[in-house]
Amino acid sequence: MPKEYTSVSKISGPLVLVENIENVKYGEVVEVKLANGEIRQGQVLEAQEGAALVQMFASTQDLSLKGMRVKFLGHVLEINLSPEILGRTFDGLGRPRDGGPEIIPQKRMDINGSPINPYSRAYPQEFIQTGISAIDGMNTIVRGQKIPIFSGAGLPHATLAAQIARQARLLNEEEKFAVVFGAMGITFEEANFFIENFKNTGALERTVLFINLANDPVIERIATPRFALTAAEYLAFDLDMHVLVILSDMTNYAEALREVSASRKEVPGRRGYPGYLYTDLATLYERAGRIRGKKGSITLLPILTMPEDDRTHPIPDLTGYITEGQIFLSRELHRRGIYPPIDVLQSLSRLMRGGIGEGRTRKDHGDLSNQLYAAYSRGLEAKELAVVLGEAALTEEDVQFLEFAEAFEMEFIKQGEYENRSIFETLDLGWKLLRRLPRSSLKRIRPEYLDEFWGKEDAS
């Protein structure tokens, strides 16, 4: 039976120091009983011989050293799991916040998990359809990939996250698909937006939500993505489901990590973030993937807002080293009313080539994507030239590419919040736009694909 200690010697911010203790381990769950009988929970942040530093899951402003009793429970944070978690909404510590009953566990799992052994990984190859052309056509996501969305303050990343969670599916409808959504440090209005959005569209029945609000304890914010990923591991590797995990906003997570680090008086790293920020992010991101011999998979889509739109900021910078590409949201496109404002030239999916082509999407997908990139890039160059020298300085072909770039933004990138395009609709739309250009300028597409999809009757 766990011992109770009354040897609390110091309370500093969210931290409580307990001395004269024994057999306490890092990450252990703690119960703190106040003089009035109220019980609060915490977690061991640091354990040394005879002492432990405890991070509380609630405010410590009204705590007093007098009458406090501390009990170390002998286990780390765990989550109750069963198939019943689908369709449920939990707080950042895995407690129901939807008014439903507690989960009767078929399994309890340590939320810290462990990254997948590189030797056991299977290479991600199968296509995931999001219904968004700028992603499916140009920056394809495959099962088991980890690819972040780099956004900025005021950009519609929350709307985009909800749309992806709502529309994402496999082309093979027979396979089981689920979404785990972990929200960190969001406002009540944002939380209500996600919950109502999923309820009203029927997406909630295949979704698990973990929501940490901005006024919830900081330590809970650090635990939230771990609860979400542990739930995803259960669905993927125990129930053989293909799981898309969306974590928003990782910037709030990193800020919480910095706050806890400052409370512990650790030596700060870049811009005040702890020196272990890279390692900590890797322990989250590397839990995504596929495992040989397992049917399920975890695909990770972390969303982060870049402070001051600075892509060299430590959070996006370190994230880029771990993940397999990125999707950039453009403030310029957003100003012009284009949703989703995805900057396809700045975005990249490093695993795209393995997930497209015949048998996965369509045989012309790779060539079409290359040609759209090249034509859009040339159109933007023509646009810059027209700004400096005037449109009169452009050749006839330059004008065609300029018009193509404008049409590409308004018809291909831009789409409705509830518009769900199939991959075949996206590819056909790409061909439709390319018909604005002379066939002779489409040098990135094989002749046989031009004959089949561009159309000989459209040749010029």
UniProtKB/Swiss-Prot annotation:
Keywords: ATP synthesis, Hydrogen ion transport, Ion transport, Transport. GO terms for biological process: proton motive force-driven plasma membrane ATP synthesis. CDD domains: ATP-synt_V_A-type_beta_C, ATP-synt_V_A-type_beta_N, V_A-ATPase_B. It comes from the Bacteria. GO terms for molecular function: ATP binding; proton-transporting ATP synthase activity, rotational mechanism. Coiled coil: none annotated. InterPro entries: ATP-synt_VA_C (IPR055190), ATPase_a/bsu_AS (IPR020003), ATPase_F1/V1/A1_a/bsu_N (IPR004100), ATPase_F1/V1/A1_a/bsu_nucl-bd (IPR000194), P-loop_NTPase (IPR027417), V-ATPase_su_B/beta (IPR022879). The keyword Ion transport applies. The keyword Aminoacyl-tRNA synthetase does not apply. HAMAP family: ATP_synth_B_arch (MF_00310). Produces ATP from ADP in the presence of a proton gradient across the membrane. The V-type beta chain is a regulatory subunit. Belongs to the ATPase alpha/beta chains family. NCBIfam families: PRK04196.1. PANTHER family: V-TYPE PROTON ATPASE SUBUNIT B (PTHR43389:SF4). This is V-type ATP synthase beta chain. It comes from Dictyoglomus thermophilum (strain ATCC 35947 / DSM 3960 / H-6-12).
